[in-house]
């Protein structure tokens, strides 16, 4: 849910290294789901996240809101959107750097533990 995502971004903000948030769709939000995804995207920019990777159909709105916030506030955050985890895997070598602090979070149905496993294998 959005509160959990924001709390996780709050914790990530304390990292001394480059901050990367890999976020996915949040499920079961009802009629406000697009607005809630946008809210999280904007929040990531305000929390000085260095890189935001959004994965999933609903997370496209998260990425768009983050990009809009970056432009409006002149924040220095890179934003990426991928439709699938597999699309992200093909690009993660160009996005992630050694010593990044990485937050991985999404609703359970997105099966993001797979991403954590993939990151561990690549480390």
Task: Cite the ranges covered by each PLM segment.
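ATP-dependent carboxylate-amine ligase
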Residues: 1-123
């Amino acid at each position: 849910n959005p509160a959990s995502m924001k709390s996780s971004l709050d914790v990530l903000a304390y990292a001394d290294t480059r901050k990367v948030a890999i976020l996915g769709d949040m499920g079961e939000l009802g009629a406000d789901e697009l607005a809630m995804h946008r809210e999280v995207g904007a929040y990531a920019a305000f929390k000085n996240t260095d890189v935001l990777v959004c994965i999933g159909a609903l997370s496209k709105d998260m990425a768009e809101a983050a990009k809009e916030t970056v432009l409006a506030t002149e924040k220095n955050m890179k934003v990426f959107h991928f439709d699938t985890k597999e699309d992200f895997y093909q690009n993660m070598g160009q996005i992630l750097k050694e010593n990044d602090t990485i937050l991985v979070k999404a609703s359970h149905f997105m099966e993001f533990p797979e991403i954590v496993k993939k990151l561990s294998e690549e480390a």
